[in-house]
């Protein structure tokens, strides 16, 4: 059985030769600097299950190497869309964010990201060439570099072998997500791009096509599926699949491996019709306050030991070549996980999401709202909630008017 742990051989002293001397200009000894990091949930080694607490190690590194007192303020998001809404609003200024490829492309085009200074990220040398230069399809052919890969992977289908018949002909296909015999046991993504993607791949459509007719075909599939779906989820999937309260779900390969460790009845496949491949990468927002410190952090995350700690904890595929080649990493992960992350993935037809035009994004959002409005489920939100909220709003207005009238009577 795979283990989600790495021994405390990852001492901070091992990182010093990798990072010392790379930065000098922002050392501040008399104040506490706060680094605001915004990442996906369950996506970093956090000290649980005998793992390394990466953010605590970064704080220690800054103190021991640069004599800086640093506090990492770490928060998480559940979808690219929710992350984008918060970052683009400017309500909170983050220093490091970790979006997916298509969202990075959008944020570059909207001038929301700062170009990176690669001289301040010497550990970039450990990133596989597959994720550099012209291979970075989401950086708009820019001469500047806006992102450093964090993890990559593909979407597949998870199913519970104690509930789903192993001889089911739908295993291996997206059709399993639409199998009526598992009504009430199927989970769908609670984000528009991935949810529509499942239907588009099932139908053999181009996920980057902007033709409304094709998107409506996908909507029809999702509307049909909603009749048998238990719920629309993101991070909630961990508890539901591990506990056996749901039987089938499309999700990310790395997260499947994490769930598998807690429930060996779970199994996984990449759909034969094709699926989504993605890269999540570290970026610095243009309005970041601590850009220099953000470079420290990104460089730290690319160091061998920290990248390996994260890869072992999250079970995602690492873009750091020294990690993938490390015998300790491969042994700790086990053949099954390595096969899913690095071997099977090479044999599967996949397509990355690209940024859609503003018009297509608006269409996608309208169709997503249409799906949710016609569904009695969706992350615990029911159609009746809209009615209830409307009634509550009317009551609130009524009470406000009533209070004002009484106030006038006593004036």
Where are these regions (language model features)?
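Conserved C-terminal helix/tail region of periplasmic/extracytoplasmic solute-binding proteins
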Residues: 344-411
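Early extracytoplasmic/lumenal segment of secretory-pathway proteins
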Residues: 27-106, 110, 239
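Ligand-binding "clamshell"
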Residues: 108-116, 141-144, 258-270, 331-337
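C-terminal motif of bacterial Sec signal peptides marking the signal peptidase cleavage site
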Residues: 22-25
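Mature extracytoplasmic/periplasmic domains
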Residues: 285-348
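Extracytoplasmic ligand-binding site segments that recognize negatively charged/polar headgroups
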Residues: 38-52, 93-245
């Amino acid at each position: 059985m795979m283990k989600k742990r790495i021994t405390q051989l990852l001492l901070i002293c091992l990182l010093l030769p990798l990072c010392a001397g790379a930065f000098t200009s922002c050392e501040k000894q008399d104040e506490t600097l706060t680094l605001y990091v915004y990442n996906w949930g369950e996506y970093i080694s956090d000290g649980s299950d005998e793992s390394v607490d990466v953010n605590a190690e970064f704080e220690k590194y800054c103190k021991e190497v640069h004599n800086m007192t640093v506090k990492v303020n770490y928060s998480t998001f559940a979808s690219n869309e929710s992350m984008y809404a918060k970052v683009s609003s400017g309500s909170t200024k983050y220093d490091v964010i970790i979006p997916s490829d298509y969202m990075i492309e959008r944020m570059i085009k909207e001038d929301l990201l700062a170009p990176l200074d690669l001289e301040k990220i010497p550990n970039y040398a450990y990133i596989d060439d597959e994720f550099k230069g012209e291979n970075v399809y989401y950086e708009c052919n820019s001469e500047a570099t806006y992102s450093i890969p964090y993890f990559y992977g593909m979407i597949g289908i998870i199913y519970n072998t104690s509930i789903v018949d192993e001889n089911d002909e739908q295993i291996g296909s997206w059709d399993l997500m639409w199998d009526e015999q598992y009504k009430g046991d199927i989970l769908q993504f609670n984000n528009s791009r991935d949810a529509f993607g499942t239907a588009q791949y099932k139908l053999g459509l181009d996920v980057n096509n902007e033709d409304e007719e094709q998107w409506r075909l996908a909507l029809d599939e999702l509307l049909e599926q909603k009749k048998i779906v238990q719920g629309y989820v993101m991070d909630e999937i961990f508890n539901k699949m591990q506990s056996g309260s749901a039987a089938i779900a499309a999700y990310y390969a790395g997260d499947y491996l994490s769930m598998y460790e807690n429930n060996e009845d779970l199994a996984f496949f990449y759909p034969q019709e094709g699926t989504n491949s993605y890269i999540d990468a570290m970026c610095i927002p243009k309005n970041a306050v601590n850009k220099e410190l953000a470079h420290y952090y990104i460089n730290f995350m690319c160091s061998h030991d920290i990248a390996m700690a994260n890869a072992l904890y999250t079970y995602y595929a690492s873009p750091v070549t020294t990690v993938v080649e490390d015998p300790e990493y491969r042994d700790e992960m086990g053949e099954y996980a390595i096969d899913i992350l690095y071997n099977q993935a090479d044999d599967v037809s996949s397509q990355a999401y690209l940024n859609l035009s503003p018009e297509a994004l608006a269409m996608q959002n309208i169709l997503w709202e249409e799906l949710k409005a016609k569904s009695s489920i969706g992350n615990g939100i029911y159609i009746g909630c809209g009615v209830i909220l409307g009634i509550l709003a009317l009551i609130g207005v009524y009470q406000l008017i009533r209070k004002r009238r009484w106030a006038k009577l006593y004036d």
